Amino acid sequence: MEISSSGSKQKSGKTNYQLLLIASLSKEIESARKLDSEKLAAEIRTVGFSCQHCGKCCQRAFGDNRVVIIPPEIERIREFTGLSKLEVAGPFVPETFQPDELDGEENSTEVFSGASEENEDSFFTEFLELFQENIDCEGNIHTFGWTLRRKRNWDCIFLEKGTRRCRAYPVRPMLCRTYPFYLEGLKLHTCECEGLRCPISVEDSRKLAENLLFRYISELEDMLAMYEKYVDFMRDEKGLELAKESLEKGTCTYIVHDSTGITKIIE
């Protein structure tokens, strides 16, 4: 459920750390715009890549399959699929389970807890410890950015059962379009993928390089806008207890910060 107002007590002014991040991001964006797409394409050809259409990058059983998305991507997917914003995306949060804890269900979307009843209390404690500095005095958990929703077995919500094809392929996020490559610190990096070290054409490498640069700059600009809009919040010792009480009742209240502002949701 999405709530229009955060209701969270806020501080005024930007923090020193926030100002440093803004300056650093502005500098990186300026440098990113000067990157040579032809040189990047040549690097991609040296590495080599050909998609194997295995769908493993969409399945949690084969590794971290979270897909970070920015607001314009959410809107494109929402318009294409007819789903609501919160059916497409959820708050970006750390994972608190291991692949052997997957429950195998495919039809419904993910829930925040991967814990059984026996160790529920320890799970809540572990979960909230990850957010200790991001819980406000009212027990709201503040997160930064969004990820694509996943099923209860933690596979991507758009991965078709059986065919392992993407139901939102024409509007898939840039992370998916450029996987297993990404740019960080102005340098090309790769994720683990069976398609690496396979031949790639000049044309395909150029298209991939263009998409990588577009993704890199778009994500940096989105992050910059988020930190420029960000307003710090009040914290106290009661916040952690309030958050735990909510979890014990089966709900979790997030305040998601992104480039458009803040969104309060209850899951």
Per-region residue spans from a language model:
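Short loop/turn segments that flank or connect secondary-structure elements
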Residues: 1-267
